[in-house]
Amino acid sequence: MLRCWSVTVERSCEGMLLRRRILSLSASSFRNFTSGNNGDAIPFSTFTKPSSSIAPGDFLVREWKDWFKHRDVKQSHQLIDRIFDILRAPSNDGDDRAFYLHLSNLRLRLTEKFVLDVLSHTRYDILCCLKFFDWAARQPGFHHTRATFHAIFKILRGAKLVTLMIDFLDRSVGFESCRHSLRLCDALVVGYAVAGRTDIALQHFGNMRFRGLDLDSFGYHVLLNALVEEKCFDSFDVIFDQISVRGFVCAVTHSILVKKFCKQGKLDEAEDYLRALLPNDPAGCGSGLGILVDALCSKRKFQEATKLLDEIKLVGTVNMDRAYNIWIRALIKAGFLNNPADFLQKISPLEGCELEVFRYNSMVFQLLKENNLDGVYDILTEMMVRGVSPNKKTMNAALCFFCKAGFVDEALELYRSRSEIGFAPTAMSYNYLIHTLCANESVEQAYDVLKGAIDRGHFLGGKTFSTLTNALCWKGKPDMARELVIAAAERDLLPKRIAGCKIISALCDVGKVEDALMINELFNKSGVDTSFKMFTSLIYGSITLMRGDIAAKLIIRMQEKGYTPTRSLYRNVIQCVCEMESGEKNFFTTLLKFQLSLWEHKVQAYNLFIEGAGFAGKPKLARLVYDMMDRDGITPTVASNILMLQSYLKNEKIADALHFFHDLREQGKTKKRLYQVMIVGLCKANKLDDAMHFLEEMKGEGLQPSIECYEVNIQKLCNEEKYDEAVGLVNEFRKSGRRITAFIGNVLLHNAMKSKGVYEAWTRMRNIEDKIPEMKSLGELIGLFSGRIDMEVELKRLDEVIEKCYPLDMYTYNMLLRMIVMNQAEDAYEMVERIARRGYVPNERTDMILERANRILEERNSRSNLGRNGWNSRQRQLE
């Protein structure tokens, strides 16, 4: 408890001056704060380098461990900690018999006060609270009271579980075992009042009064307070009159009245009411003073709050503990903590303003949010010097401090000493430590920490879980990440949202697709959303295993989740299904039916399956799907015809392709694109004569062949050394008004390097140069590459000449580089630098050519050295 104020006026004046100094010195910081602070969470990713004023980490951890070890721990607190550990222990498939047995073995002597202490200690873990409350109700010799029910109701409301509480009250079954110690009607009034349903609470109160029953002082005050909280001020006056008539007016009544004035915004009336209590009821004044101070500070009226504290302190009969704690909390929250050491120095002389450990802790956590590590160090050191007994929050704050300060080893040492010093890390501390260890690349230690947290029943959230599992995957330890997921799933502690979790893709990348599928099943059972990337990794992993059935199920589930697969992904799945040795048609049909039911434009679905079957080397299956379109009353589109034709051509079913094309021609459906597909496909199938036939037929139909048609035909003609026809096609292509493409130019120069026939065919087409002057340069280049003519331009600048004939690409530069290496190997690296300057990226072929240049230069150097050594030897012999 805080020390009482001194009665002397001199000390009082000193206190007023000190408090005003705090406010005046912090005014500027307060102004800055009003535009800054924006949250309560301490960011994990923010690490701040501590200043040189902070002692070395190894020294700090030793000193603080001794301080924590010798703290004053009451036996009852140790017992409550033991109860809390039992309550948090995970149960086996919902069977709570083991935890009931463990609690019974403690042979607890249950009293109202002890139950309230346990509920207070576990109030932030709702499940633990409810389990203990239920267990206590079943113990012989103990019955829940108004106070214990009030406590559990407040805890449920604080956790925003009002619906659960109201459902409990509506059924009224939870009170059956408490009837002889707690009347049902009393409990219902108190319960609904705490739940905020004052209308129902008043109905039950009316029924009580009608039957001649009445509330006691406790019940009246709970109801009165609820009416204030819900701003039911008309009903408030009625209940207050009932309290007055029965003589129940006490300090609690006064504090509720002050709260009412504050809720109504009547702060002046609240102050007048408090001052009226000073002469005859200082206890009532003290209980309401904190409420008024809190209201003033919440409206930024710090000067008024300070003045009120000063003046009431002068009376000397009012307990100021609660009011001062609220005042200090408001100062901390408002940002008056820029200089913690100065703040503590000015607070400490104020009698009645002795800080308790929980207030120190609130200052420490506020500074941690602001990354003020010097301030945290000052306060923790001040606590240790003053002999303030730390509690678990203090130790958790120390661990967070070590993490933020970058003292990773020290944080780990403090964590490992938890049994020695009685340290129970909170979920926040676990989060801090795991993030710090991951940032330090100590993923195995982070794994041990998270495994320990899961074993102790802590739920750490998706961010921490994803951070560690991803870190393990990046470190090449996906098996450890898998074990982590399994451990969390077994204890029902798997986060529902795991943003960016890479475990599935990591397992698939190392070939452990079965493990990845198993992890995905755990995710599904635990309600974890499977992301688009997870689905994609699993599908490609299944394709690698040639499990088209699994890939098909996954892509169906993927779309049911609202994701849209890419065309290539779907095509690969269809291809995998088609390539399965058995049962291909079943899965193929199932997948097709699903897609037809999902897509509004059914032609797209049919086309996708025709394409997939063609890629899988199943043209008959592709034709089966194509024919299904007619049976379903859907007219195949040009795209459908193209995909079917490509399916035949890719699988070298030339006769079927020709027959299919003939049928389309009979139906008048041979469009320009179909001709192009036919010509290109025949060339790739090495059916050059047929391709040339369709090229001529296409031109006869008045259709202009595409650039690709010319390119593939020219390439095939050159491959078969039909250079006259190839040059003729080049001439025809150029006459159509199109510029020579890089592909055509490279094919001509490449073949010119292999054979002189290209140049000879070119010379037989002299009319080319007469009608198209820029073709003269191309002819000279062909002659140069054939070795038939010489040019005055340096080889390393030949790209400028080529650029006048057709656009350059990396293939062109590699040909040039190869010529340079053959003739002037020492210029090779200069040419590579020129390539890079012009914005082209060398590839593997470039590297191979450079390696050849190195070998040529090394051979030259070796021969030169041998010749020099031989000359020197002969000279010595002559001498």
From Swiss-Prot:
<feature type="repeat" description="PPR 1">
    <location>
        <begin position="181"/>
        <end position="215"/>
    </location>
</feature>
<feature type="transit peptide" description="Mitochondrion">
    <location>
        <begin position="1"/>
        <end position="44"/>
    </location>
</feature>
<feature type="repeat" description="PPR 9">
    <location>
        <begin position="461"/>
        <end position="495"/>
    </location>
</feature>
<comment type="similarity">
    <text>Belongs to the PPR family. P subfamily.</text>
</comment>
<feature type="repeat" description="PPR 15">
    <location>
        <begin position="671"/>
        <end position="705"/>
    </location>
</feature>
<dbReference type="InterPro" id="IPR011990">
    <property type="entry name" value="TPR-like_helical_dom_sf"/>
</dbReference>
<feature type="repeat" description="PPR 11">
    <location>
        <begin position="531"/>
        <end position="565"/>
    </location>
</feature>
<feature type="repeat" description="PPR 12">
    <location>
        <begin position="566"/>
        <end position="597"/>
    </location>
</feature>
<feature type="repeat" description="PPR 7">
    <location>
        <begin position="391"/>
        <end position="425"/>
    </location>
</feature>
<dbReference type="Pfam" id="PF13041">
    <property type="entry name" value="PPR_2"/>
</dbReference>
<dbReference type="Pfam" id="PF01535">
    <property type="entry name" value="PPR"/>
</dbReference>
<protein>
    <recommendedName>
        <fullName>Pentatricopeptide repeat-containing protein At1g71210, mitochondrial</fullName>
    </recommendedName>
</protein>
<keyword id="KW-0496">Mitochondrion</keyword>
<dbReference type="GO" id="GO:0005739">
    <property type="term" value="C:mitochondrion"/>
</dbReference>
<keyword id="KW-0677">Repeat</keyword>
<dbReference type="GO" id="GO:0003729">
    <property type="term" value="F:mRNA binding"/>
</dbReference>
<feature type="repeat" description="PPR 2">
    <location>
        <begin position="216"/>
        <end position="246"/>
    </location>
</feature>
<feature type="repeat" description="PPR 13">
    <location>
        <begin position="602"/>
        <end position="636"/>
    </location>
</feature>
<dbReference type="InterPro" id="IPR050872">
    <property type="entry name" value="PPR_P_subfamily"/>
</dbReference>
<feature type="repeat" description="PPR 5">
    <location>
        <begin position="320"/>
        <end position="355"/>
    </location>
</feature>
<dbReference type="InterPro" id="IPR002885">
    <property type="entry name" value="Pentatricopeptide_rpt"/>
</dbReference>
<feature type="repeat" description="PPR 16">
    <location>
        <begin position="706"/>
        <end position="740"/>
    </location>
</feature>
<feature type="repeat" description="PPR 10">
    <location>
        <begin position="496"/>
        <end position="530"/>
    </location>
</feature>
<feature type="repeat" description="PPR 4">
    <location>
        <begin position="285"/>
        <end position="319"/>
    </location>
</feature>
<feature type="repeat" description="PPR 14">
    <location>
        <begin position="637"/>
        <end position="667"/>
    </location>
</feature>
<feature type="repeat" description="PPR 8">
    <location>
        <begin position="426"/>
        <end position="460"/>
    </location>
</feature>
<feature type="repeat" description="PPR 3">
    <location>
        <begin position="250"/>
        <end position="280"/>
    </location>
</feature>
<keyword id="KW-0809">Transit peptide</keyword>
<feature type="repeat" description="PPR 6">
    <location>
        <begin position="356"/>
        <end position="390"/>
    </location>
</feature>
